[in-house]
Amino acid sequence: MQRIKKGDKVVVITGKNKGGSGIVLKIMPARQQAIVEGLNKVTRHKKKDQTTKRAAKQSTGKVQQEAPIFLSKLALFDQKAKQQTIGKIKYVMDPKTNKKTRVFKKSNNTL
């Protein structure tokens, strides 16, 4: 079961981006990786594509973009407690809406 989902605030706990934080843009469950906003930037060299009509809208040259990071290098960030949590989450039924909500196990704050 995956504890990190799209839209979660995460912190990098190992690697060259250690200590950096951002919001998860995309999860790739088959590869166990995630793309985090503003982290793990790589440079791609893109040519101008002349075959499509969208060629004018595409950026060309050196383009900075986010590369995937393994989920094992990420930890959820509890914004209320201002600390990282290693994914211990429990689901609690919300009495008003009758839906499950994700709660940090350590601080009992909702995500």
From Swiss-Prot:
Residues 43-62 are annotated as: Disordered. GO terms for biological process: translation. Pfam families: KOW (PF00467), ribosomal_L24 (PF17136). SMART domains: KOW (SM00739). InterPro entries: KOW (IPR005824), Rib_uL2_dom2 (IPR014722), Ribosomal_uL24 (IPR003256), Ribosomal_uL24_CS (IPR005825), Ribosomal_uL24_KOW (IPR041988), Translation_prot_SH3-like_sf (IPR008991). The keyword Signal does not apply. One of its GO terms (molecular function) is structural constituent of ribosome. Keywords: Ribonucleoprotein, Ribosomal protein, RNA-binding, rRNA-binding. Signal peptide: none annotated. GO terms for cellular component: ribonucleoprotein complex; ribosome. Part of the 50S ribosomal subunit. HAMAP family: Ribosomal_uL24_B (MF_01326_B). One of two assembly initiator proteins, it binds directly to the 5'-end of the 23S rRNA, where it nucleates assembly of the 50S subunit. One of the proteins that surrounds the polypeptide exit tunnel on the outside of the subunit. Belongs to the universal ribosomal protein uL24 family. This is Large ribosomal subunit protein uL24. It comes from Mycoplasma pneumoniae (strain ATCC 29342 / M129 / Subtype 1).
